[in-house]
């Protein structure tokens, strides 16, 4: 899962800090979630999905996180 999130984030040219800001969490917290140490909350998954779609990546939430 984590490699997919990182891959899509890199594909759209965003940093971990930018995604952390999008989610309203610290960069450290985001890094732990992307590394699979902590889980993303449902609302965070939805925000990431919406941002990727806004940036032209047309995929489902399950393709990103599962």
Predicted regions mapped to residue ranges:
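A short, Lys/Arg-rich alpha-helix, primarily the initiator
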Residues: 1-11
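Residues that mark the N-terminal boundary/hinge immediately upstream of a DNA-recognition element
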Residues: 4, 15, 41-44
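Residues within the helices of the helix-turn-helix
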Residues: 6, 17, 62
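Key DNA-contacting residues within the recognition helix of helix-turn-helix
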Residues: 6, 31-32, 49
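The alpha-helix within a helix-turn-helix
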Residues: 9, 20, 49
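Short alpha-helical DNA-recognition segment
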Residues: 14-32
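DNA major-groove recognition helix of helix-turn-helix/homeodomain DNA-binding modules
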Residues: 41-61
């Amino acid at each position: 899962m984590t490699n997919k999130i990182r891959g899509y984030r890199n594909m759209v040219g965003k940093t971990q800090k930018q995604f952390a800001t999008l989610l309203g969490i610290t960069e450290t917290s985001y890094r732990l979630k992307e590394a699979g140490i902590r889980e993303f909350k449902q609302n965070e998954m939805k925000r990431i999905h919406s941002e990727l779609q806004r940036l032209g990546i047309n995929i489902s939430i399950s393709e990103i996180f599962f």
